[in-house]
UniProtKB/Swiss-Prot annotation:
The keyword Nucleus applies. Residues 707-769 form the Cullin neddylation domain. Neddylated. Deneddylated via its interaction with the COP9 signalosome (CSN) complex. Probable core component of multiple cullin-RING-based BCB (BTB-CUL3-BTB) E3 ubiquitin-protein ligase complexes which mediate the ubiquitination and subsequent proteasomal degradation of target proteins. Probably acts as a scaffold protein which may contribute to catalysis through positioning of the substrate and the ubiquitin-conjugating enzyme. Required to target mei-3/katanin for degradation at the meiosis to mitosis transition via its neddylation and deneddylation. Functions in ubiquitin-mediated degradation of CKIs to target cki-1 for degradation. There is a cross-link at residue 721 (Glycyl lysine isopeptide (Lys-Gly) (interchain with G-Cter in NEDD8)). Belongs to the cullin family. PROSITE patterns: CULLIN_1, CULLIN_2. Residues 568-596 are annotated as: Disordered. Disruption phenotype: RNAi-mediated knockdown at L1 larval stage results in the disorganization of myosin thick filaments in adult body wall muscles characterized by the formation of abnormal myosin heavy chain myo-3 aggregates and V-shaped crossing of A-bands. RNAi-mediated knockdown suppresses the age-dependent paralysis and growth arrest induced by exogenous dipeptide repeat protein PR50. The keyword Lyase does not apply. One of its GO terms (biological process) is ubiquitin-dependent protein catabolic process. This is Cullin-3. SUPFAM superfamilies: Cullin homology domain, Cullin repeat-like, Winged helix' DNA-binding domain.
Length: 777
């Protein structure tokens, strides 16, 4: 039908067909038909049913407003059916087929409810959707099974007990039908209708409690007797793996995670201190015996243990504490070891081995964990710097390495060795102390030609420069520049002296050092032998002619010389009355003449000057040597001790006074005519060790402290010049930040240097705030 509106538009109207009403008898007949069909479906006799006809009948009832009757009727039919199913389940409760009966009834019920839902789909879509207080057809069936079966006559408790018993058998490696457990778990989850409550209440919580009790008993056995932490943790990991495999087969995924958490709590968290500190089997035992596999396992297990009252900070914190304690104990034993303190190379080697071990552990066992890495670095820094000689020892190790230790290694191995020792260098807090010693040893290597390779030296300098900046290596690089000039200087001097009328009787090489660059100790001028004096005067003349305005000051402390010596031994039967010296024979046996022995003695400059005196004296006292040569007393005694009291194979001189270790000024010395050596070239080593004595350490420390005062003052001036005004705390913080790569200045020293700068009028206190300072231009 169509019509026109007043404005000329068209309107379309749809007329619904007339819906005839149905009487009560028809409704009753329709319901009875549906009821019988539902019951047949529940009995699994649905082959003769017409689902299309049944759907139309249900549709008609809902369409004519009889949905409530249909819904309530369905509810009654389901409850009646559940009652009959319950009887069958109760009868099987004491038989071995209980779980199978439950599973079968559940499967039949869910299949039937799917079919019933399809028949009553229109009721779900219309009646159920319009009434919020009723459940959809399928969920109605689930609710009925839960209330009429699961929670009746102890059926739910019996299901739980049966499941727990099967799981207990499975844990004891008995064969079970795990499919039955999985089906029961799936059923309990489905009965929750979009919630895990039923599953959790009926099964999961009891399972977790039973798991906790079971493994608590198991742990007691594993921790008893002679079992150690390595055995215990291996058993824990096996149990965790088995339980995870078991859970993945027939338990819910969320339950698997909860079970593993319970096991972590019961098996690890509750015993964590016992595991870590177990006597002859804990973390210390693993570290001492390099049990890498066990350390990897304990890290893997402890990583799962979170922060709790039982384990504050978590499992890794407890593990890290124990590992750190071992590292500190081992490192402290190294830096305090009396034998190692006498041998700096072994001292550093032990530390490097410890560092390599823990670096390897960090990668292989501890998964490069950042907290472990930071703690290891902190611990190394702590115990390394607890020994104030560490900077000296690291410098000595580098010195030994750069002399001859790297000649037989490849470039890659050399670079690896340098990188390793640079790691220890980074841990040093007093890098300025290291620098002072390193300069001394570098100077000796360069001056005495003891360096294995200039390339290796420069490679190390490059690493130091990268680590500490160009200011740290500036003077070191200048020392190498001086060395490069020596060759040119030596060649031109040789050409110059060839043209001179005065000829030198000795071959001499003089090296010019830039003042302020080389860490040499100034020595008072000594009296040089005539040959040396002439050579020095010629070189001075040559150098001052070539470099106008420069002044040369001779320093004999770091020189060396080859001295030709001839020893005239007495007859073989003669006996000595002195320390390794000659004397008249005390026996009547025949004398056998011995040939003179010609040697080349490799000595330092002062030793050479001392030895040349014996060309003019048969014997001479220490006092006389000092008077004639002007060598300082301490230096003179050191060299005499090396020449007369050193190794037997190096005793060029003999002392006339026997028995004393220390040399007195009255002691007299003579040439040791009995001196013998298989070597033609004999190198005389200084008796004093490489490590500084206590007075030398104090002297070096004092020099370092004096240098630090200047560095602190320079840093204060730099900062204040840039900031103009700054309060005390901020100034201290900035000075510390600037200098920490060389040393850690104490607030007291900084305050003292501030006061000095105020007195010298570089700074002034602020008039309004006496805790603040102003820079005075």
């Amino acid at each position: 039908m169509s019509g026109r509106s007043g404005n000329g538009g068209q309107q379309k109207m749809r007329i619904r067909p007339f819906m005839a009403t149905i009487d009560e008898q028809y409704v009753t007949q329709t319901w009875e038909l549906l009821k019988r069909a539902i019951q047949e479906i529940q009995r699994k006799n649905n082959s003769g049913l017409s689902f299309e006809e049944l759907y139309r009948n249900a549709y008609t009832m809902v369409l004519h407003k009889h949905g409530e009757r249909l819904y309530n009727g369905l509810k009654d039919v389901i409850q009646d059916h559940m009652a009959s199913v319950r009887i069958r389940i109760i009868e099987s409760m004491n038989s071995g087929s209980f779980l199978e009966t439950v599973a079968e009834s559940w499967a039949d019920h869910t299949v039937a409810m799917v079919m019933i839902r399809d028949i009553l789909m229109y009721m779900d879509r219309i009646y159920v959707a319009q009434n919020n207080h009723v459940l959809p057809v399928y969920n109605l069936g689930l609710d009925a099974y839960r209330t009429e079966i699961l929670r009746q006559n102890g059926i739910g408790d019996r299901i739980r007990d049966a499941l727990l018993e099967l799981i207990k058998l499975d844990r004891k490696s008995n064969q079970i039908n795990w499919h039955g457990i999985k089906n029961a778990c799936d059923m309990l989850i489905s009965l929750g209708i979009d919630s895990r409550t039923v599953y959790e209440d009926e099964f999961e919580r009891p399972l977790l409690k039973e798991t906790s009790d079971y493994y608590r008993d198991v742990c007691k056995n594993w921790l008893s007797g002679d079992n150690d932490a390595c055995f215990y943790l291996a058993q824990v990991e096996i149990a965790m793996h088995d339980e995870a495999s078991r859970a993945s087969r027939y338990l819910d995924k969320m339950t698997e995670a909860k079970i593993l958490q319970v096991m972590d709590d019961v098996m690890v968290a509750e015993h964590i201190q016992t595991i870590v500190y177990m006597q002859n089997g804990g973390v210390k035992f693993m570290l001492e015996h390099k049990k890498i596999e066990d350390l990897t396992r304990i890290f893997r297990i402890f990583k799962r243990i979170g922060d709790s009252v039982t384990v504050p900070g978590g499992g890794l914190k407890a593990l890290l504490k124990a590992v750190s304690e071992y590292l500190n104990e081992t490192g402290s034993n190294i830096v305090k070891n009396e034998d190692l303190l006498k041998n700096p190379v072994n001292f550093v080697n032990e530390l490097l081995q410890l560092k390599d071990y823990f670096s390897s552990l960090l990668t292989t066992a501890f998964a490069d964990d950042r907290d472990f890495k930071n703690r290891f670095q902190h611990d190394f820094e702590t115990f390394l710097n607890s020994n104030r000689q560490s900077p000296e020892f690291v410098a000595l190790y580098m010195d030994d390495m750069l002399r001859s230790g790297l000649k037989c290694v490849s470039d890659a191995e050399m670079d690896n060795k340098l990188d390793n020792v640079m790691i220890l260098f980074r841990y040093l807090q007093e890098k300025d102390v290291f620098e002072k010693y390193f300069k001394q040893y570098l100077a000796k290597r360069l001056l005495l030609d003891k360096s294995c390779s200039d390339d290796v030296e420069k490679a190390l300098l490059a690493k130091l420069k990268t680590e500490c900046g160009c200011q740290f290596t500036q003077k070191l690089e200048n020392m190498f520049r001086d060395k490069e000039l020596w060759l040119t200087l030596a060649t031109s001097f040789r050409d110059w002296r060839e043209a001179q009328p005065t000829k030198m009787s000795i071959d001499i090489s003089l090296r010019v050092l830039t003042a302020g660059v080389w860490p040499t100790v100034q020595c008072n001028p000594v009296v040089l032998p005539q040959e040396l004096s002439v050579a020095y005067e010629m070189f001075t003349q040559y150098y001052t002619e070539k470099h106008t305005g420069r002044k040369l000051t001779i320093n004999t402390l770091l020189g060396n010389a080859d001295v030709k010596a001839t020893f005239y031994p007495p007859p073989k039967a003669s006996m000595s009355n002195e320390e390794n010296g000659p004397g008249p024979s005390s026996s009547g046996e025949s004398m056998k003449e011995r040939k003179p022995e010609h040697k080349i003695l490799q000595v330092n400059t002062h030793q050479m000057i001392i030895l040349l005196q014996f060309n003019h004296h048969n014997r001479i006292s220490c006092q006389q040597l000092m008077d004639e040569l002007k060598i300082p007393e301490r230096e003179l005694k050191r060299n005499l001790q090396s020449l007369a009291l050193g190794k037997a194979s190096q005793r060029i001189l003999v002392r006339k006074n026997k028995g004393k270790d220390a040399i007195d000024m009255s002691d007299e010395f003579a040439v040791n005519d009995n001196f013998q050596s298989k070597l033609t070239r004999v190198k005389v080593q200084m008796v004093t060790g490489k490590v500084e004595s206590e007075p030398e350490i104090r002297e070096t420390r004092q020099k370092v402290e004096d240098d630090r005062k200047l560095e602190v003052e320079a840093a204060i001036v730099r900062i204040m010049k840039a900031r103009k005004k700054l309060n005390h705390n901020n100034l201290v913080a900035e000075v510390t930040q600037q200098l920490r790569h060389r040393f850690m200045p104490s607030p007291i020293i900084i305050k003292q240097r501030i006061e000095t700068l105020i007195e010298r009028e570089y700074l002034a206190r602020d008039e309004h705030d006496h805790r603040a300072y102003q820079y005075i231009a």
